[in-house]
Amino acid sequence: MKAFTQHNGLVAPLDRANVDTDQIIPKQFLKSIKRTGFGPNLFDEWRYLDVGQPYQDNSKRPLNHDFVLNHERYQGASVLLARENFGCGSSREHAPWALEEYGFCAIIAPSYADIFFNNSFKNGLLPIILSEAEVDELFKQVEASPGYQLSIDLQAQTVTRPDGKVLSFEIDAFRKHCLLNGLDDIGLTLMDADAIASFESRHRASQPWLFRD
């Protein structure tokens, strides 16, 4: 997993509350066992005017030009600004996978659904919680200022606006450590590789009948 330390990026405003995981990545795209290939279908039902299908050539599909991510000014956005209860609905790691592959590395919202919140951290996506008042002000500034960017410092736990105002956010110390060091569940396990190998050796010696060579 790629480490997250600091990021300065263009902000895209998704001014909708209660965005669920089926809206983030619709169910028909969940058939793949790979964790790649979901970015092109992020928010598929909003980005396109037709019904998308797996392995379809999206370049030939009709775009919904009213949807924010199809606006020219938000192309290349890497910070998603959202409303409350983002990521509600069924559990699917495909949701943070799709957001990351599209190009987002952080989300800012007043609140998140618990499962999506946890899945985001495990997949290197930083979900930042700010107050509703702070988020409201960000929406106003983003829409009034083309090219609006935010600077995120995970170590300092701050989001800095273009006008210099610094917004602070809270984050669990363990999750912060994992993001700063690029540690997912596999990475954390590998840190104890020597201890695991030692246990397996002792276990094999004490109960050899459990093993087949």
From Swiss-Prot:
Which reaction(s) does its UniProt entry say it catalyses?
A: (2R,3S)-3-isopropylmalate = (2S)-2-isopropylmalate
Q: Which GO terms describe its cellular component?
A: 3-isopropylmalate dehydratase complex
The UniProt entry's GO biological process terms, in alphabetical order, are: L-leucine biosynthetic process
Q: Which GO terms describe its molecular function?
A: 3-isopropylmalate dehydratase activity
In its keyword annotation, does this UniProt entry include Amino-acid biosynthesis?
A: yes
E.C. code: 4.2.1.33
Task: Please give the pathway this protein is involved in.
Answer: Amino-acid biosynthesis; L-leucine biosynthesis; L-leucine from 3-methyl-2-oxobutanoate: step 2/4
Is Translocase found in the keyword set? no
Any Pfam family from its record, for instance, is Aconitase_C
Q: What's this protein's family per the entry?
A: Belongs to the LeuD family. LeuD type 1 subfamily.
**Whom does it interact with, and what assembly results?**
Heterodimer of LeuC and LeuD.
Stored PANTHER family: 3-ISOPROPYLMALATE DEHYDRATASE SMALL SUBUNIT, 3-ISOPROPYLMALATE DEHYDRATASE SMALL SUBUNIT 2-RELATED-RELATED
Q: Per its database record, what is this protein's job?
A: Catalyzes the isomerization between 2-isopropylmalate and 3-isopropylmalate, via the formation of 2-isopropylmaleate.
Q: Report what the protein is called.
A: 3-isopropylmalate dehydratase small subunit
Biological source species: Pseudomonas savastanoi pv. phaseolicola (strain 1448A / Race 6)
